[in-house]
Amino acid sequence: MNQSKQSLSNWLLIGGVIALAVLPLIFVRDAEFTGADSQAEKAISEVKPGYEPWFKPLFEPPSGEVESLLFSSQAALGAGIIGYAVGLYKGRSQQQRHKE
């Protein structure tokens, strides 16, 4: 792949990521962006109002901000591990091609 095609591909990917982040904020006005846990809790309370959960979390974050911090840290760690694995396998495949 020549340099101009790769550069165009990179810019298209960056544009796609930006569009995925911005378009929902523009087109879905006044929407509640809640997590799946909150949505599930709401659905369960509508179906069975007196339901009591049978499991308690091992750790309850003291605030929503701490919960968001833990969630984003977990996402960053996962992305780092996936990025490392992709880079490792790409490097191995390039090394194999250069040996041949």
From Swiss-Prot:
GO cellular component term, pick one: plasma membrane
Predominant subcellular localization, coarse grouping: membrane
InterPro entries: CbiN (IPR003705)
Membrane-spanning segments: 8-28, 69-89
Superkingdom, natural source: Bacteria
Single GO biological process annotation from the record: cobalamin biosynthetic process
Single Gene Ontology MF annotation: cobalt ion transmembrane transporter activity
Cross-referenced Pfam families: CbiN (PF02553)
Keyword Transmembrane: yes
Associated pathway: Cofactor biosynthesis; adenosylcobalamin biosynthesis
Keywords: Cell inner membrane, Cell membrane, Cobalamin biosynthesis, Cobalt, Cobalt transport, Ion transport, Membrane, Transmembrane, Transmembrane helix, Transport
Cell compartment(s), UniProt: Cell inner membrane
Topology class, membrane: Multi-pass membrane protein
Subunit: Forms an energy-coupling factor (ECF) transporter complex composed of an ATP-binding protein (A component, CbiO), a transmembrane protein (T component, CbiQ) and 2 possible substrate-capture proteins (S components, CbiM and CbiN) of unknown stoichimetry.
Role, per record: Part of the energy-coupling factor (ECF) transporter complex CbiMNOQ involved in cobalt import.
Stated family: Belongs to the CbiN family.
Protein name per UniProt: Cobalt transport protein CbiN
Annotated organism of origin: Nostoc sp. (strain PCC 7120 / SAG 25.82 / UTEX 2576)
